[in-house]
């Protein structure tokens, strides 16, 4: 965000102030199961839930720039982009089950033109 000029200042200070929240207002992903946004607690009591083999979750970083955000250059306003993967937790680590889905600009444009 700093490199693009959307935020100004030191990265450490911007993170400390949660300045990125203007562009990314939710978490990195969610459970995936019988429903697109499957239910389940992310914490058990005060502890984060330990991932177990067979659990499926999304990893979906993105940027969302409001049309009304006058703190950024006009060329950025109204843009939203997200790259999403679906991941299965395995005994050995994880399996990205959407690894073959197009993600680059060129791949996506070729798919759309087909």
Q: What feature does the model see in each segment?
A:
Residues 1-32, 55:
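Active-site cores enriched in adjacent His and Asp/Glu residues with nearby glycine-rich loops
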């Amino acid at each position: 965000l700093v490199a693009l000029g959307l935020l100004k200042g030191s990265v450490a200070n911007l993170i400390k102030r949660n300045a990125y929240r203007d562009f990314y207002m939710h978490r990195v992903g969610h459970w995936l199961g019988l429903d697109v946004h499957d239910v389940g607690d992310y914490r058990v009591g005060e502890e984060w839930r330990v991932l177990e083999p067979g659990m499926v979750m999304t990893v979906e970083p993105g940027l969302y720039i409001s049309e009304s955000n006058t703190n950024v250059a006009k060329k950025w306003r109204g843009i939203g982009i997200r790259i999403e993967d679906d991941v299965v937790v395995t005994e050995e680590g994880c399996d990205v089950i959407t690894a073959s889905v197009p993600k680059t600009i060129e791949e996506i444009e070729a798919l759309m033109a087909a």
